[in-house]
Structure formats: C-alpha cells, structure tokens
Amino acid sequence: MTSSGTIDISDGTVLRLTSQDTSAALDASLFNGDGTLVNATDGVMLTGELNTNLETDSLTYLSDVTVDGDLTNTSGTVSLQNGVAGDTLTVNGNYSGGGTLLLDSELDGDDSISDLLVLNGNTSGNTTVVINPITGIGQPTSTGIKVVDFAADPTQFQNNAQFSLAGSGYVNMGAYDYTLVEDDNDWYLRSQKVTPTPQPDPEPTPDPTPDPDPTPDPIPAYQPVLNAKVGGYLNNLRAANQAFVMGRRDHAGGDGQTLHLRVVGGRYHYTAAGQLAEHEDTSTVQLSGNLFSGRWGDDGEWMLGAVGGYSDNQGDTRSNVTGTRADNQNHGYAVGLTTSWFQHGSQKQGAWLDSWLQYAWFTNDVSEQSDGADHYHSSGIVASLEAGYQWLPGRGVVIEPQAQVIYQGVQQSDFTAANRARVSQSQDDDIQMRLGLHSEWHTALHITPTLDLNYYHDPHSAEIEEDGSQISDDAAKQRGEIKVGITGNISQRVSLRGSVAWQKGCDDFAQTTGFLSMTVKW
C-alpha cells in the first residue's frame, strides 16, 4: 500500500499491518514527509507494528485507537488532541518512546478527565508530552490526573519509559502549575511540591528510642504548586498599601515645618506561601505643606496640612519549585490631608497626636514568559492615627514612645488574567499596628543623630483569590525595625535629614530602606 497524502480510517475499520512489506511501504509513504494517518472516529484497531517516526512537520492522529502490536514513536509525534478530553490510545504490544505525545486534558482536581495512553507491553524511551488544557480552573491535586496507564503485569513486562512535559516541565491553569509525576508505574498530572526524601535512620539507633509527646503531625503528602504570577499579584498588593505610609516626622506640620519633601527608596524580600521567593524595589516621593495652624489652650498647638505623592515599585517572583519567574510593577499617586496636635507645642515636652488620610490609585502589571501579561488597577484609602509622648530629660536628649494604627484599604479591581483565570482580592482591607521608641540627641554642631526601634504587627496577610482558590503571602505578620539617621541644619530655615532602616521578620522577610528629606520653615 502506498500513499503520498492522508488516509482516513472510518469508525470500526481495521487496518491490518501484518506483512513486513506492508509495514515498509507504510514507513516509506504514509509516514514520510507530509503524509499523515488521521483517525477522526472511534473504535479503530491497527493490527501489526506501527512506526510513527515522521518528518518534523508530520503527525499521526491515534485518538481512541487500539494498536494490536508494537508502537514505535522514537522521533515522531502521536496526537490524541481533538478538542475533547477522554480519548484513549491502547498499545497491546511494546511501546518505544523518544518522540512527542499530544493530549487533551481538563485541569482541575483528581477527578479531571484526560486523554489516556494505555500500555500493555514492554516500554522504553523518553517521550515528551504536550498538554492542551481543554477546560478547568486549576485546583490542588492529591492522586493526580492519570495520563499514562501501564496496564501490563509488571512481573512479566518491563516498564522503562519516561514521560516529561514539554518546555519548562510545567503546564499552568489558574493559580496552579502541574507537572508529570510517576506513581506505581503510571504517570499523573499533579500540582505537587515534591517533599524531600527523609534522611536514613541514625546509626547506631538511639537508646532509649525518642518518644515525642505530642506526636508530630505528618507532613502532607502533596503541597500544591503555585504559579509564579500569584506572587506578582501579592507583591503589587503589598506595595500599594505600603507606598505612602508615614509617621508624624515624615510630613509637614508634624514637627513645626511649613514645607516638607520626602524621598524614600527600599528593597525587601520574603517567601510567600512557602514556595514563592518575592523581591521588590520601591521608591516614593511625597510633598507636604501646612495649610492652617493655631493655638490649643494655653500653650497647645494644632496644624492642618496637605500631602501628595508618587510611587513606583518593581519586583519579581521566582518559584522555588518550578524555577519559573514572573515580573510585577505598579505605579501610582496619592493625595490627602494631615493633622497634628501638640499638648505643649511641637518643641516642648508633652503628649501629641498625629493623623493623616490619603486616597491612592495605581496601575499594575504582572507578566510571565509562558503565560502572558496582565494589566489591572487598584485604588483605595490609607489612613493613620499615631500617638506619642515627647520626653526631654535634658542635655539635648529626646526620648519618645509611640503607638500607631494604620488602615490599609487599597484594593485591586477584579480582572481576567491572560490564562483566562478570574483574579480578585479576597481580603478587603487590613489594620497594621506599630509600637516604637524614638530618640535623638541635639548637639552644639547643629547635627542631630536619631535612633528608632519599631515593632510591626499585621493581623492579616495580603490575600488574593484566583478562580476560587484563595492564596495568602503569609509573610511577616510580625517584624522588627532598627532605623538610624542624622539631621543637619543648612540654615535657620532649611534642614536635611537622612536615615536608613532595616526590618527583619518571619518567612525570610528582610527589608532595607533609605530616607532623605528636606524641610523648609518660614
């Protein structure tokens, strides 16, 4: 039999490849160049040896086909893809891999439907698998989605074939990445973080044998693998709510100033959800000024001011599981009002209150090379109420305990990502709390060193929802900060201040921030 085009095999037809000459003719004509064997219907049986070693632009469609003999696919492409998951290719002889296998599959949980390769003989070779996601929203898996079934008796047949996903080795749906995992001779698509193999038992065995109480809970067998873009969404959300946060000395009115320019640049990193390495570079410029001021009682003082700012933040997320990377960026503006009250004036010993409220809006971008780019917006209110007591023990020393409550209400808009997943913010707002101690020392040289010690507590983490799956960064709910700085007077009206702050918290959180500000009084 010879052919230079396409042979269509109808439903129920048997193509018998029993002659060596026939097989050779098929290899030379049907499966050479652009020749393609197409099976568009169910129930076809091929009897004999089938060799699919094609040219690079050729394809063998074997959807719902039984090969009652050997299947050799060492350099060709076998496809079950027809836009519908659930087709089966059964090989009753030996299978030799090395080429490519194309499959349709739903990508949800363990009960997802997928095309299936059933092997009933000896297997060998490395086959590259290309998954076409038909539908699904992405869900964690336990057992996984079976795509290769070694149905032969392992005591009589050898199973040496290896299967791996094309490209990065992962396929994405929604918030999760799936990879191929071998389990009991079969192959499954799983969103699974591989748990390291336990270390061998110590030699010699401890005597007596440890008996911990309570008994530790076992580590879950499977931990879902998150797509790197999830970290980008979390990075943008955290940066938007932190960009314009300030204390009473960071704006005009809080320390008797009339005009205050503040420039902030920083870098932080942490591990989100136990597997996403987050990095972020932040920069913010804020300009504030007094609008009104007046006396309060005998020697008290109050001030009302305005503030505006711009922030640009860029970061990246790298999966510790897959090695894939996503980039994120957001930039935005904020405008608002500030108020300050001093019991005995800003330069005297006594209690004080400081507050501000700003409306912020951002444009956000998250991109990943194999998963496209996402563009969306976020906006909302950030506000603060801060209280402290300025104690002047003498010799130019200032010691000031502080407490601050910060409302973080910047929320991202709902949007559809490039992978067709629906992304929203599941935690609407948050309250951040800070306890601190500020100290400074005024010298005769008009230079004032400063030292701040702060403790931050975030009751909630940044949290998003992607196609019904809620993911939290679980990062740095508690962290400490040390900030050192110096203030110098250029003239009676103008002063400069610079400082550097270091933060450290749980989940590998670390942040370094530099501050530079100029104040003008008149």
Feature locations, PLM:
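Outer membrane beta-barrel transmembrane domains
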Residues: G336, R420-W522
